[in-house]
């Protein structure tokens, strides 16, 4: 049936094999990302937030000296730490996905720059 523009059986089998391998690797990657702890800190280092590689919040640390400066300073530092952690985890996730897919351009939602 190659005359109808269909791939031959060998090509189809190889495509399925590759898809299964990617699926297995994706499951492993999911577990690795879940186990990661990625830290983001405020510029002065007095607020830190840790996210998993899948961007799940894990913990927060705020130095007492920051809290003593009041609500506005604390909120600003916490937001900066969260943004830093999110940026690091997004970069890590993107790099891991690119490694998993072997550089295939899959245009995954939320993973483009």
From Swiss-Prot:
Q: List locations, semicolon-separated.
A: Cytoplasm, Nucleoid
Which Gene3D superfamilies has this protein been placed in?
Nucleoid-associated protein YbaB-like domain
Q: Which residues cross the membrane?
A: none
**An example molecular function term from Gene Ontology annotations:** DNA binding
* Pfam families with a match to the protein in the record: YbaB_DNA_bd (PF02575)
**SUPFAM superfamilies, from UniProt?**
YbaB-like
Q: What InterPro entries does UniProt report for this protein, alphabetically?
A: YbaB-like_sf (IPR036894), YbaB/EbfC (IPR004401)
- The main location is cytoplasm
Does this entry carry the keyword Cytoplasm? yes
Function, as annotated, reads: Binds to DNA and alters its conformation. May be involved in regulation of gene expression, nucleoid organization and DNA protection.
- Which family, according to UniProt? Belongs to the YbaB/EbfC family.
Q: What is this protein called?
A: Nucleoid-associated protein PMT_0025
Q: Which organism is it from?
A: Prochlorococcus marinus (strain MIT 9313)
